[in-house]
Regions:
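Extreme N-terminal starter segment of soluble prokaryotic enzymes
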Residues: 4-8, 133-136
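Short beta-strand-loop/turn "lid" adjacent to the catalytic site in phosphate-handling enzymes
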Residues: 61-91
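Conserved phosphate-binding catalytic cores of ATP/NTP-utilizing and phosphoryl-transfer enzymes
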Residues: 1-5, 97, 101-124
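Short glycine-rich, Thr/Ser-proximal phosphate-binding strand/loop in the N-terminal lobe
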Residues: 7, 12-47
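Structural motif
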Residues: 7, 68-70, 209-210
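Short, well-ordered amphipathic alpha-helical segments that serve as non-catalytic structural scaffolds
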Residues: 48-61
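A generic structural motif
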Residues: 25-26, 67, 159-163
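Conserved catalytic or regulatory cores that recognize and/or transform ribose-phosphate-containing ligands
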Residues: 125-260
C-alpha cells in the first residue's frame, strides 16, 4: 500500500523498470518488471512502451503527477542522441505531465558510489536518496524571498550539495529596493552592467545538476521568467518549490525536492 506524503521513484533501465516508494530517507521496492528497451528505437514503439508503463503506474499509485512521481532513465536511454532524448522527454511530458530525467553517465556513477556507501547493491536509487545533486543553482526573487532561499541553502548545505549561485546571502544594502539586487562583492557600473551579472548567474546553469526555483505561493518574478529559456536550452532539470501559477507556456518541470 502506498503511504501518503511519499514519493514514487521510477527507474527505467535497458531491460528492467523498477518502482520505489520514498518516505523520508527510506526507500522500498514496490515492483520490478522486465521491459526490453534496447530492442526499440526512438519511434512509436518506444513511446508506447513508456506510455503503457505509466498507465500501469496509475493503477498502483493514487496520484501520478510531477510532484509525487520522479522518472529516471539510464542504460540504453543514455545512448540516444541529444535530439532523440529531447523528443522522448517531450513525449512523456505531453502525454503524462511527468519529467523523464535521462541521467548522464558521470551522474549515474556518482549515484552508484553514493549508494554503495549505504548498501552493497549497485543501485542508483539508493544514491539518489543519499545525495541527488552535486551542484545546483537557486533562482528566485532575492527582493521578496530571501528568507525562503536561505532556508533552501541551509538544507542543501546539510546534504553536501554545492550551490553555484547565489554564492552568498550577503546583499549590497544600497541595492535593496532597486530593480537589480547585488550580492556582496558585486558592483554595477551602469544599468547595462546588470546584464553581465545576470549572464554570469545563468552561465552557471551549465555546471549544475538541477536548477531549483524558490517560488513561495507560486510566484515567479520577471527575472526568473527570463531565465527559463536558458535552462531549457541547456537541458537542465527544473524544480520549483511550489506549483508555479503564471507560466505562459508549460514545460517539463518538477515540484518539490525529494528531501524536503
Amino acid at each position: 500500500m502506498i503511504e501518503k506524503d511519499s514519493k514514487i521513484l521510477v527507474h527505467f533501465d535497458t531491460n528492467d523498470t523498477s518502482i520505489y516508494q520514498l518516505k523520508g530517507d527510506s526507500i522500498s521496492l514496490i515492483k520490478k518488471e522486465r521491459v526490453f528497451f534496447n530492442e526499440t528505437l526512438i519511434h512509436d514503439e518506444l513511446f508506447k512502451k513508456i506510455d503503457y508503463f505509466i498507465e500501469k503506474l496509475r493503477m498502483i499509485v493514487e496520484k501520478v503527477d510531477n510532484e509525487s512521481v520522479r522518472l529516471y532513465a539510464t542504460g540504453v536511454f543514455q545512448e540516444f542522441s541529444e535530439e532523440e532524448q529531447t523528443q522522448l522527454i517531450i513525449h512523456v511530458f505531453v502525454n503524462s505531465g511527468l519529467c523523464l530525467n535521462i541521467i548522464k553517465p558521470d551522474l549515474e556513477q556518482f549515484y552508484i558510489e553514493k549508494g554503495l556507501e549505504k548498501s552493497n547493491e549497485k543501485n542508483i536509487i539508493n544514491g539518489i536518496v543519499q545525495q541527488e545533486f552535486r551542484k545546483v543553482v537557486i533562482c528566485g526573487s532575492f527582493q521578496q524571498n530571501m528568507q525562503e532561499i536561505g532556508n533552501i541553502i541551509e538544507i542543501l548545505n546539510k546534504r553536501n550539495i554545492q550551490i553555484l549561485s547565489p554564492w552568498t546571502m550577503d546583499i549590497v544594502q544600497e541595492s535593496l529596493g532597486t530593480d537589480f539586487i547585488l550580492l556582496e562583492g558585486q558592483e554595477l557600473v551602469n544599468e547595462r552592467d546588470a546584464w553581465r551579472h545576470k549572464y554570469d548567474h545563468m552561465n552557471k546553469f551549465k555546471k549544475a545538476d538541477a536548477i531549483i526555483i524558490c517560488n513561495p505561493e507560486g510566484r515567479i518574478g520577471k527575472g526568473t521568467m527570463f531565465e527559463f529559456g536558458f535552462m531549457v536550452a541547456y537541458s537542465k532539470r527544473i524544480i520549483f518549490t511550489n506549483e508555479p501559477n503564471n507560466l505562459s507556456i508549460p514545460f517539463p518541470y518538477e515540484i518539490g525536492l525529494n528531501f524536503m
